[in-house]
């Protein structure tokens, strides 16, 4: 913007209290110019800047006398470049939102927003007038250790986690001062798993030691989860475990609480499962199940085993007088007969002739079921499979076809076919061909 005669007054660039510009002269090197004294008192300038709306109309003072009292505490030291201030900032001068920051050390950060970013005016050199965008102009009110005139820490967004690379503390002194003002986020853990986050804060302070503390009004929020270091896995003393930390602690085998129990029915002292009867007394598993199923105590005396039918003492066939048989039967009169005589009478309704009597018991192989036959044939076929010396696809397919009538899957003979060769014929090449050659090959 060219300076014309219509703009009569030149004032200093900014006052420390008005624009929060408490920057030392080193922030703007090479800006030593001759300045004119301000033609308004300091308090009047504050009223002019903060009591005028966007159209240049006066509005009631929002901050009252406290702002003036605060402003008067700072001496009017003049430094910076010259700016042309129009009379009372009339509405004819539009807001310039496209200005760029001329000094590269002011970092634009989403955490450095100021509620008065529209009125901050900054120049790197006398000449063009530019108004900073909110993200750039807010860095003028950077976090100094001295108290600020207007310090309204912005509310951090709830969905976005803070970026440690954009906002890091400058030095140990400013970090300690700003830690008292910023919000503290803590990871809520059980009492036995409390983690110390002081080491992470110290590492973040050391990390940001090279950057200037004058560009960040709010320090880094503590990380929501500590860094992957020894703090994430606390020592074993916090967990009360073995020296390996999370290792399982071998505990001595607890003494069985079932020692001293005894079954009130049979007197057993060991059982897979202790049960109780209706009165609450302990029963072993066998006695308890018997009592549950039959409603009475399990008999202690085992019944005598019945002698096998073949060796039943004193029993003889009423027809052939034999004493050995696989099964004793009875005839129509109720007399015991051997298995052979009883079946013969059942089939022919006459007694078996004595001429058919044999000393030995004739036995025969029972007819195997179809399922047993299939299982046996599959087993024999699998035993013969490793004996085949040549393992070629043709022999394998023939062998599997021989098993097709045994396997429940009728299509097993088609499961293994002659495999395709791994290497293509020499006549085929997979290199890049010209389209004409491909047409020739297809034809």
Swiss-Prot record:
Residue numbers of Phosphoserine PTMs: 114, 161
Localization annotation: Nucleus
Presence of the UniProt keyword Flavoprotein in the record: no
Phenotype upon changing residue 346 to A: Moderately decreased Th2 cell differentiation
GO molecular function: cis-regulatory region sequence-specific DNA binding; DNA-binding transcription activator activity, RNA polymerase II-specific; DNA-binding transcription factor activity; DNA-binding transcription factor activity, RNA polymerase II-specific; DNA-binding transcription repressor activity, RNA polymerase II-specific; E-box binding; histone methyltransferase binding; HMG box domain binding
Gene Ontology cellular component terms for the protein in this record: chromatin; nucleoplasm; nucleus
Region (Disordered): 1-28, 143-180, 193-214, 412-443
Record's keyword terms, sorted: Activator, DNA-binding, Immunity, Innate immunity, Metal-binding, Nucleus, Phosphoprotein, Repeat, Transcription, Transcription regulation, Zinc, Zinc-finger
InterPro entries membership: TF_GATA-2/3, Transcription_factor_GATA, Znf_GATA, Znf_NHR/GATA
Annotated segments matching region Interaction with TBX21: 1-257
Region (Flexible linker) residue spans: 288-316
4Fe-4S found in the keyword field: no
Residue ranges annotated as motif YxKxHxxxRP: 344-353
First-listed, main subcellular location of the protein, grouped into a coarse class: nucleus
Known tissue expression: T-cell specific.
Biological process terms in GO annotation: anatomical structure formation involved in morphogenesis; aortic valve morphogenesis; axon guidance; canonical Wnt signaling pathway; cardiac right ventricle morphogenesis; cartilage development; cell activation; cell fate determination
Expression induction: Up-regulated during macrophage differentiation in response to IL33.
Domain of life: Eukaryota
Zn finger limits (GATA-type): 263-287, 317-341
PANTHER family according to UniProt: TRANS-ACTING T-CELL-SPECIFIC TRANSCRIPTION FACTOR GATA-3, TRANSCRIPTION FACTOR GATA FAMILY MEMBER
Function: Transcriptional activator which binds to the enhancer of the T-cell receptor alpha and delta genes. Binds to the consensus sequence 5'-AGATAG-3'. Required for the T-helper 2 (Th2) differentiation process following immune and inflammatory responses. Positively regulates ASB2 expression. Coordinates macrophage transcriptional activation and UCP2-dependent metabolic reprogramming in response to IL33. Upon tissue injury, acts downstream of IL33 signaling to drive differentiation of inflammation-resolving alternatively activated macrophages.
Description of how the protein assembles with itself and partners: Interacts with TBX21 ('Tyr-525' phosphorylated form).
Domain statement: Binds DNA via the 2 GATA-type zinc fingers. Each zinc finger may bind either adjacent sites in a palindromic motif, or a different DNA molecule allowing looping and long-range gene regulation. The YxKxHxxxRP motif is critical for DNA-binding and function.
Name of this protein: Trans-acting T-cell-specific transcription factor GATA-3
Gene name as annotated: Gata3
